[in-house]
Amino acid sequence: MFKIYAVSDSIGETAEQVANATAYQFGSSVKVERVPYVKTFEDVNNLISIIENPNEAMIISTIVLVDIREFLVQRCVESGIHISNVLGPCISLVSTILNKTPEYKPGAVWDMDKKYYKKIEAMEFAIRYDDSKDHSGIKHADIVLIGLSRTSKTPLSIYLANKGIKALNIPLMPEVPVPEELFEIDRKKIIGLTIDPMHLIEIRRHRVDNMMKIPTELKYANAERVLDELEFADKIMRKLKCKVIDVTKRAIEDTALIIMESVFSDRII
């Protein structure tokens, strides 16, 4: 099996993301292995030594340290291993355009700066107010997600938190009063999540099956119940006059991008 080694002088997430995106185009015939913290010549030699068949492997590197990066390229050439350096050409191009020498800081994405702590704070916020009955966080949230159960509210909250955005989610259910705080904040912050009824029924039935619920609890995935819930949610969203996004078969990343462009259209995240 062909293997892509995602190599970095930091934790390797960027290299792994590029490697996974590449491997995805070829199905199960390509495997990805992350190799983080390659910071010395010895680390490079150890990496090269574990690649048994150069014809069935390649390296995707985000190593920033110039001497290590160049040594890795040299060893790959000597060993007949294909290598693609992701950051090198980008850094060189920007350096040329700006006529400025780069700082070559490994792991710059994870630098312990204000953005990092903002991300941690947002993660804690999302966890604290996930499907919570405590509505005190609504006025402090950057984004408030509202929608039925299984419309990706929680994954979206966590994804947005990873961008440093405080996201809070409110489940909509006919039996539960809508928080008054929703009517007291800027409606631009509120995002309604809707979904195709048949798709929602399918998702809920799958969840019920996985949780081995007894038949008396199948109301959750009942078609009539789902339609009633969707009608209720639609009524609330129209009353709030908030932006509504259809999440049917939409990736979390795509939905999050739409949300950020809508809420933060006047500033950069």
From Swiss-Prot:
Pfam families: Kinase-PPPase. The keyword Hydrolase does not apply. The keyword Transferase applies. It catalyses: N(tele)-phospho-L-histidyl/L-threonyl-[pyruvate, phosphate dikinase] + ADP = N(tele)-phospho-L-histidyl/O-phospho-L-threonyl-[pyruvate, phosphate dikinase] + AMP + H(+); N(tele)-phospho-L-histidyl/O-phospho-L-threonyl-[pyruvate, phosphate dikinase] + phosphate + H(+) = N(tele)-phospho-L-histidyl/L-threonyl-[pyruvate, phosphate dikinase] + diphosphate. It is an enzyme of class 2 (transferase). Keywords: Kinase, Nucleotide-binding, Serine/threonine-protein kinase, Transferase. GO terms for molecular function: ADP binding; ATP binding; phosphotransferase activity, phosphate group as acceptor; protein serine/threonine kinase activity. ADP binds at residues 147-154. It comes from the Bacteria. Its EC number is 2.7.11.32, 2.7.4.27. Belongs to the pyruvate, phosphate/water dikinase regulatory protein family. PDRP subfamily. Bifunctional serine/threonine kinase and phosphorylase involved in the regulation of the pyruvate, phosphate dikinase (PPDK) by catalyzing its phosphorylation/dephosphorylation. This is Putative pyruvate, phosphate dikinase regulatory protein. It comes from Clostridium botulinum (strain 657 / Type Ba4).
